[in-house]
Amino acid sequence: MIFDEFSIKTLIRPVQDFPRPGVVFRDITPLFQSPKALRMVADSLIQRYVEADFTHIGALDARGFLVGSILAYELNKPLVLFRKQGKLPADVLSQAYSTEYGEAHLEIHADSLCEGDSVLLFDDLIATGGTLLAAAQLVRRMRANIHEAAAIIDLPELGGSQKLQDIGIPTFTLTAFALSDR
């Protein structure tokens, strides 16, 4: 299936003033209501990574789980979940980070990765980069490597992709929105 950025962008709903005034939230739930759009997103990412040399998919809580699990299944890679604080039942490593909304913690099971593993990080969106940067710090603390950070959407004006690239993490997104896009 050929990727159609226009079709994908029309299914990403802008929600004004959510979760707080002044923020335009990019809601991807309409993508999941369209089997064609979901297949287009998944197939585009699978084509990009089908021959890539990494060992794990690292999916970020919560919307990153949706497509990350499809990628792990289709690419036959183990799926590592990066969860919000307090959601994992066993021993964890934790990393504080800032978001466009405030401060939070990201956690991973302490036995999820081994030294030398290579991880494709996946989230729905790159905004300030806080969540992906925290995931990258956790991966590096486990002496594993980051293959790339990928997402459906980039908000380049918020600088997250650039921050990731500045610390040597390549990024890939299927589409981007300017903050002024409605």
Swiss-Prot record:
Pathway given in the UniProt record: Purine metabolism; AMP biosynthesis via salvage pathway; AMP from adenine: step 1/1
GO CC terms, sorted: cytoplasm
InterPro entries linked: Ade_phspho_trans, PRibTrfase_dom, PRTase-like, UPRTase/APRTase
Enzyme class (EC, first level): transferase
BP GO terms, sorted: adenine salvage; AMP salvage; purine ribonucleoside salvage
Catalytic activity reported: AMP + diphosphate = 5-phospho-alpha-D-ribose 1-diphosphate + adenine
Top-level taxon in the UniProt lineage: Bacteria
Subcellular location: Cytoplasm
Keywords: Cytoplasm, Glycosyltransferase, Purine salvage, Transferase
Enzyme Commission code(s) on record: 2.4.2.7
Pfam families: Pribosyltran
GO molecular function: adenine binding; adenine phosphoribosyltransferase activity; AMP binding
Record's function text: Catalyzes a salvage reaction resulting in the formation of AMP, that is energically less costly than de novo synthesis.
Family: Belongs to the purine/pyrimidine phosphoribosyltransferase family.
Assembly: Homodimer.
NCBIfam families named among the record's database cross-references: apt, PRK02304.1-3, PRK02304.1-5
Protein name: Adenine phosphoribosyltransferase
